[in-house]
Amino acid sequence: MNQKPSLFARLADGSLVLQILVGIIAGVILATVSKSGAESVAFLGQLFVGALKAIAPILVFILVAASIANQKKNAKTNMRPIVILYLFGTFSAAVTAVLMSFAFPTTLALTLDAAQASPPEGIGEVIHTLLFQLVDNPVNAVITGNYIGILAWGVGLGLALHHATDSTKLVFADVSHGVSQMVRFIIRLAPIGIFGLVSSTFATTGFSAIAGYMHLLLVLLGAMAIMALIINPAIVFFKIRRNPYPLVFTCLRESGVTAFFTRSSAANIPVNMALCEKLKLHEDTYSVSIPLGATINMGGAAITITILTLAAANSMGIQVDILTAILLSVVAGVSACGASGVAGGSLLLIPLACSLFGISNDVAMQVVAVGFIIGVIQDSAETGLNSSTDVIFTAAACEAAERKENA
């Protein structure tokens, strides 16, 4: 007689996406029925995001070092085409945002108090910050979640261990698998974590605060939807020469949904790593491309910077010609690649883009304040687009390389 699996075993083996959907619905219901009850379960979401953020730096460092150390000689990692896809995708997002802003011009009532923050003075400061992140103390890089530094030291250690004995390489490979197992366990807790995140978000913010900026929000979300459902699939089709939507929808469902609620590309790195493993991608490739993507693949950030900057220009009565808009796309694309190196991310890079039009820092910071008000949805959608695109482009490059080899 076969023994029936326990409830815990059934939950552990069940569909994670379905469980997350149940968590979202339960969170909305709880926030609607009892605001105090919803606020009391906020710690579940904080615990989940905290666990992901805690494991992600260690996972990236160990995986990168182990994959490079164990890499066979002359093995191809396909990193060059992936980086090109990341940069092209980010620039395409900025151009899409410009077109959306021209089609649906947005103006803002700039009467808010300027947000208290310290935006970077220019592109030079963003690059300066990134270069110093590169040479950060490796222990400090892991503690603070500085993924530029983690990648640099992980690659350095991996290259140094490339000529080590097989037993040393095996130890690193075993540690890498051990950390991956811990990540799988944390990801299985996603439904509980997302239940807490959704409950607290609806209870504390609701939609009343963002109702006044609905037009701006719709333009932002529209640009991100076009990027996710039209531009990205077109780029993927160009690479793999087949229907891109099965891959795109898989990545949006399994990476984008989690990223939407955690609102952190760094916290979503373990989720993306697990998805790449599920898609049977080359570990030597995705162990480097996913954390790199969390740093430089910032299509969502480019959209946010561009649309809010053009909204500021429209509000000030500044006429923007097409050449200036193209220049803005380049600036937004480059700035977005440095968004992970700035506290406050894409929003605090808006003053940098506003400087193109001679908009004062005081006015620009009022636009940033508007960004923080709609941030509960804008930041979630931006992170969902950024993070899911990391896997989409990595998978597309890997499949294109395989097709080329088999031709």
Swiss-Prot record:
Primary site of residence? membrane
Topology versus the membrane, per the UniProt entry? Multi-pass membrane protein
A Pfam family matched in the record:
SDF
A biological process term (GO) from this entry: serine transport
Q: Where in the cell is it found?
A: Cell inner membrane
Q: Which GO terms describe its molecular function?
A: neutral L-amino acid:sodium symporter activity
Record field: catalytic activity: L-serine(in) + Na(+)(in) = L-serine(out) + Na(+)(out); L-threonine(in) + Na(+)(in) = L-threonine(out) + Na(+)(out)
Question: InterPro entries recorded for this chain?
Answer: Na-dicarboxylate_symporter, Na:dicarbo_symporter_sf, Ser_Thr_transp_SstT
- Range of residues in the leader sequence: none
Q: What does this protein do?
A: Involved in the import of serine and threonine into the cell, with the concomitant import of sodium (symport system).
Q: Which family does it belong to?
A: Belongs to the dicarboxylate/amino acid:cation symporter (DAACS) (TC 2.A.23) family.
Which NCBIfam families does the UniProt entry name for this protein? PRK13628.1 (NF010151)
Its recorded name reads Serine/threonine transporter SstT
The taxonomy runs:
Bacteria, Pseudomonadati, Pseudomonadota, Gammaproteobacteria, Alteromonadales
Gene name per UniProt: sstT
